[in-house]
Amino acid sequence: GVGALQWDAGAVLDARSESSRNIWTVANPFGVSTSLNNFTASNVVNLKRALWENSGTNPTDAQATKLINFVRGVDSYDENKDNSTTDKRWKLGDIFNSRLVVVGPPKGKTTSSASKDHTEAYYRHINGYKAFKTGASCGVNCAVRDEVVYVGANDGMLHAFDSSSGKELWAFIPPMMLPSLKS
């Protein structure tokens, strides 16, 4: 069954300032890139071309900054038409047709069963799972890492939330989603 509500990701995120969010993407003003970019207005030069890719328009830095800030949660387009762009706006897109995934420390059991029972636990044993879980190849801290909830939202982002507090740890905008953020 479903237990009691532990936290509301949207409400926790809404309580944060837009500037304190860690939103990342991959963008390069000169084409293909493999390096992460912080999705902030101070990085407008690297983000502008990717945001308007294949649109046939060349936006100003001010237009791109407005969009970047809007995606981060600023009311830069005065959505409620009250002549104020300082209003708070909901920062989390609706989570629709996305299934969350919880990732935490490895918990898989192993067994050295002499019967070779073909269970998942035996498979882990013969493939060195125990050594992986506690060794350097798992980043040493693997066995004690915090539990994180990952979910996609209709704001174009993959969000990572701390499973205990609901705090957004970071969000990632896939490069192919950047041109769609204007819609």
Please state what every model-predicted region is:
Residues 1-183:
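A fold-level detector for beta-propeller and closely related beta-sheet-rich head/sensor domains
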